[in-house]
């Protein structure tokens, strides 16, 4: 299979609005990679443990819109976190060729962790995993 197999030719069904939720475990690195290259690839390998009781729950609320472009807001524990939005924007741009409907909807991304944010546990990894 090649990447072309994952590019849809067209969608035959659409949804007006809806909500999806997912939960993903976090991890903590014992040996952390240092730096990235290319398309966000690590320069060296890392070793980490999955933390079964530390997870991120993300809900994606969506509704159709008429305007062009990506339209979304990110909330952490009920508060708007615009600082998270550039990472989501980049993710949407990278997957758009496979998910062209992303520009047809306005998204509200609500996320929360079962552990403190910025505590050394990989919340961005579990958050992106739950979103994907």
Q: Language-model segments: which ranges?
A:
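DPxDG-like acidic metal-binding loop motif
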Residues: 121-132
């Amino acid at each position: 299979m090649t990447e072309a197999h994952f590019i849809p030719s067209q969608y035959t069904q659409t949804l007006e609005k809806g909500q999806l939720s997912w939960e993903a475990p976090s991890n903590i690195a014992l040996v952390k990679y240092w730096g990235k290259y290319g398309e966000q690839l690590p320069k060296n390998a890392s070793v980490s443990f999955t933390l079964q009781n530390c997870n991120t729950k993300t809900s994606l609320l969506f509704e159709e819109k008429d305007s062009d472009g990506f339209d979304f807001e990110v909330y952490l524990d009920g508060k708007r976190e615009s600082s998270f939005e550039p990472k989501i924007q980049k993710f949407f741009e990278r997957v758009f060729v496979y998910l062209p409907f992303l520009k047809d909807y306005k998204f509200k991304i609500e996320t929360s962790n079962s552990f403190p944010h910025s505590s050394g546990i990989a919340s961005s990894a579990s958050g992106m995993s739950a979103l994907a």
